[in-house]
Amino acid sequence: MSTQTEPKLVTQIDFARAGQITPQMKEVAEREHRDPEYIRERVADGRIAIPANIVHIKKGMRAFGVGEGLSTKVNVNLGISGDKADAAEEWKKVKIAEDFGADAIMDLSNSGKTRQFRQQLIDETPLMVGTVPMYDAIGYMEKPLVKLTKEDLFEVVRAHAEDGVDFMTIHCGINKSVTKSFKETGRLMNIVSRGGSLLFGWMEVTGNENPFYEYFDELLEICHEYDVTISLGDSCRPGCLYDSNDATETAEMIELGKLCKRAWAAGVQVMVEGPGHMALDEIAANMKLQKRLCHNAPFYVLGPLVTDIGVGYDHITAAIGGAISASSGADFLCYVTPAEHLCLPNAQDVLDGLMATKIAAHAADIAKKVPHARDMDDKMGQARRKLDWDAIWKCALDPVTGKKRYEESPAATEGTCTMCGKMCAVRTVNKVFEGTTIDLGMED
């Protein structure tokens, strides 16, 4: 008889490879109108991730699948900023994210002791929760950047895992080889990733390799213990159109592809992050390249923004790029608000950014033929044909805003709106088919 013990199954990918369908896989399958085996197969080979920390599962989180054949997920960024620290305002943003259909919240708090806010968020929200431990490191350890050690950084990662964070953006791909490429080839906007810039600065001052790259296996051990999904951060994403698809971005993407395989081998789930700023005609090719280089891992993108001059309207520039990126293979969109490049977003900015991104994600899902993606659109068509406003609100992504605008401008003719009144085309054709009088209010 063999004395070897079976390896302990901890992560979703562990269970999937053992042929077991977890409750989270079943939940994802039901929500996505897929067979549970469809989900299990793709979790097993890394094409789908279910970011669900074992700690957060015990607190009642909902399971969300990210990846091939699933609906495009949407993330909301928030968190306490040093220049405008207001926890109450951030909780308003959490409520908006939950009420208006976000799938994930990333706590990007970077001021002081952030653990209380993070722990409360994980305790209270059923959505996926992500963080960037590098943002937290300086406040957590109470040290200047260049004094941080590898042990310090990994202590912060472990603290986030213990708290129940479902996915962490960790900039593992920016190693000495990538920074050499960056310094040799140059860029218009240099490095615009906050976490990536901090690591680049640390590497340049200390002369050391990126500890998240050098000690990647140790990082994987922490993530495996809690089933934290690694979201491989793209330190070298383009910060302007000029830098898109350059040698530095591609060099890092190649490194991220290698790290995907190492993570999967260790039983750790992976997502890969992407651009950024990118011209409209380059997006589809970039998505396909990423999927190839990173072995079809779920792709998590920030837009991309399709122009650099939409200041104050970057939720629109990002939604345009997001619709194209998601319809071309991206699986997860990070929202962008009107405040992008300007200031910390307020609650209204969060709502505007979330809705713009949800529209982009939904449009992409229709194009990708995601099961039942168009159902609500068809119901909306039926409701509008009947001029059934109550049904219209039930179909709308944001019924609150739609109903508010409609009621602020009451029409004189029942069933119509003030744009057309009695000249409403839908009303006119309905009357034709009903055989009733077409009264336009202009008759003698």
What are these regions (language model features)?
Residues 1-10, 442-444:
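Basic/polar N-terminal segments that are highly enriched at the extreme N-terminus
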Residues 180-204, 238, 242-244, 344-444:
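Catalytic or ion-coupling anion/metal-binding cores of large enzyme and transporter domains
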Residues 3, 11-15, 20-309, 313, ...:
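Alpha/beta enzyme core
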